[in-house]
Amino acid sequence: MKASRSFHRIWKERDSAQPRLLETILYKDNFNRAYKRVKANKGAPGIDGMTIEEALPYLKEHQQEITDRIYRGKYTPSPVRRVEIPKPDGGVRKLGIPTVIDRTLQQAITQQLVPIYELLFAEGSYGYRPNRSAKDAILKVKEYAEQGYTFAVVLDLSKYFDTLNHEILINILRKNVKDERVVQLIKRYLKSGVMENGVVIDTEEGSPQGGNLSPLLANIYLNEFDQEYLKRGVPCIRYADDIVLLAKSKRASERLLESSTKYLEERLKLTVNREKSRTVSVFAIRNFKFLGFAFGRNGKGIYVRVHPKSWKKFKSRLKELSSRKRCQSIKPSLEKIKVYARGWLNYYGIASMKNNIDDINGWLYHRIRMCIWKQWKKPRTKYKNLVKLGIPEHYAATIANSRRKYWYISNNKAVIWALNKERLINSGFYDLATAYQSVHVNY
């Protein structure tokens, strides 16, 4: 009852600067647009099991009832459903999946807060923002490096989304969200709890990844850090919780590491992972990695490169998609490779990597030939297909009856000629070298 009365008092005393922000959030057009965005993003049900498709008729019938409860201060968001996603380093990333109704409400709030905060966010913030990308962040680091900022402070925040201090966040929100009812509604989402193994656990800190509002709140929180270092004249590039500060000397970067760690831990009550946070030259290929990229320099200047760990992951995934076990039917495998490789190149296409791409492209052609050779199975089938593709009969017979391993035979000159690039491309092969040239030309 106390919370309800407080909400009613807030409703009467709301600041006149944004007297109808809550009404704007709950306006039918905004709400409908929010549902369409949630539907487009797809996603799993929350703790109530309601799917996105099932939510539409429910909202049509109950939308007025939901908005009335919010206006009266009686709406209580459902706890989020805990989901754990494995991380490459062996740990897990904890996600909190809200119900579809709560995702829609969070999206409706986000749509009205974004225009307010886009005017306030620092230029160096790139994550979860309209018309900004990881590529923009990387190109900004390159621009600073060309100006002599070649030493980096790489800051690693431990479990950032799970450790946002609610009191600090609410006070930050109040600076620019003048309708206190909206602040209180956001607070209810922060305090909604997490259901884990059938038990609801209170959330005293954090904004679980998985909600539509969480990315914006994460940016609002760390905007305090961005603005502080902007005032100090320090180049700060941030993508969500990946932070890089830049300096012109090793000594200056060491001072920055100390001061930034102190600010994050004392002012924002976050935990800096001291083992992973460090000062390093931006050209240290093994030690400097930002958003999967690294930097190099030669006689022509500074260039963007793909970090070795990103290369390793890329090749490992291609190897998995082109394994002999997966290539029982070659066309579906080629389509999966195309979808994955196209997405990878769209992200990493800003990097200079012609030689590396050529090497991987040749290796991938070899693997696809190996898959096709295995798919042909019997010597008789191999012989018929080789002859059909223009290989002389006596040579085709020798190759078809060879007991050499798939990898060796698939690199035979006759097999390479029979299954040449043009034929494989016509069958659906995604030529990495050609695709790279088309995406890299813009950089």
Question: PLM features: residue spans?
Answer:
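Charged, compositionally biased N-terminal leader segments and the immediate start
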Residues: 1-29
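Core structural elements
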Residues: 26-31, 79-81, 88, 328-348
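Short, charged alpha-helical motifs in flexible N/C-terminal segments and linkers
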Residues: 39, 43-51
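Amphipathic alpha-helical blocks
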Residues: 54-77
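Conserved polymerase palm-domain catalytic core
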Residues: 69-84, 88, 120-282, 287
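A conserved non-catalytic segment of reverse transcriptases
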Residues: 191, 267-335, 340-342
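Short, solvent-exposed helix-loop connector elements
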Residues: 202-205, 303, 319-332, 344-356, ...
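Extended C-terminal regions of large enzymes
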Residues: 367, 376-443
